[in-house]
Amino acid sequence: MENSWHIHLIRSRRRSVGIRIEDSGEITVRAPLRMPEREIRQVLESKRSWIEKTLAKISSRPQLPKLTAEEVNALADRALKEIPPRVAARAKQMGVTYGRITIRNQKTRWGSCSAKGNLNFNCLLMLCPEDVLDYVIVHELCHRKELNHSPRFWAEVAKVLPDYKQSLKWLKTEGQTIIGQIQN
């Protein structure tokens, strides 16, 4: 196994091995309590190509300065002012209802929608282009019709934003650079 990999092993009651690569390049491996280390190494070896590709992608990303707590709070305040009216307008356009709107500082999600219709949005959306912000809002509101990512769900997104794939691509390529600005 590659010596330059920084691996953090967490044992838990899970049934399978999970691998997560942090922006720092640290690899977090979650494995069943009784799984032998040999088997964990085999899983890592089988995922070597993906791990190396992901690590290369991380190291090639531009390193933006970390946001201070004050800057994150300012983004959250701005998001609290700007996102709810946009959600209300899109919900009316789409004919859907929703519950509470919460603004959070998250490292893994841009938005989410609960089964009760409560919406969560990442304050870092304030650093994204407007069309990307609109895409995330529409994406979450479409979950009010389809609480999954089935073809029907994506058809709902496309009805409202026919070119949504451009915003989705932007999030996948540029989003991690923005999320990388959060202090650990």
Regions found by a protein language model. Give the residues of each.
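Active-site-proximal or metal-binding-adjacent scaffold patches in catalytic folds
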Residues: M1-Y135, R144-N184
